[in-house]
């Protein structure tokens, strides 16, 4: 059997209410050269029956079944281990997808022979509220020329996108050769995989379009089924730092990593006994103000260093509210740039029209038209 261009890996836990629309959205992609690997992570509902029926209807689907719930990270690893595609795409079983998702990312991957391709997403709640999230892919930071890599954006590499795997395409050989694996953490189990990949990739591309619609606020997900460790993100950050040090990349990416650490510490729901000790351990102590990407983060960082446990929690709560304000600012900036580009294109079109009218009105144009009229009539015959 010929290998597919792409392996789409989808972990599922108790997804009877959501998995069918997700699978339908994948199978209806405009570019059909892919396999779908669904990992049933010991679901206790009708998920297994639904996936079995899907397999009967479409030969591109393969199903792995776990006897015990392992979590999203190990499930993705298991799917990756049996994948046959040239590229890997990790999607969630409760999300929705644009029909050109595969075609868009595959086209960019082929165009630049990419190790990774980043793309946009937004969010929606089951009740119907939709919202954009420009942090999934910050178009301001994407280098103009593709492919790009860490050398083009060392101080803001990890601010280019969030760590979620479902906004990224990976070349399978690149992932396997570099030993990229998802952690078995209860949450934040994707950070080591995606950010190590971003740091190591030699050829990265980006598709600015929103191609995934991510469902939020749903109970019963894989992570929810295994409980939540609110400080698991610290283990993930430690692992990322260690990988960067092993690869000799930490110094080059230190400023971007520091922003990553501060962002996640401020946005987290809980606090360790001492943020100062955490920052020291992760190598982000004594940061100057100019090192921070987002306005106000330096002030919050300095306050967090001195904060007690209770104060740290309060800062995190306030930052969470401010996060969506910043996301809205990024979206407004995108819209303003789009409007500016539209104005510039309109100005060029107007200039071209005026130049054309001036040419038509010129004596040389009128004389030339008169002289060539007989020839044009002969051609029309």
Predicted feature locations:
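Conserved short acidic donor-positioning loop in nucleotide-sugar-dependent glycosyltransferases
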Residues: 26, 41-42, 70, 93
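Short, acidic, metal-binding catalytic loop of nucleotide-sugar glycosyltransferases
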Residues: 24-33
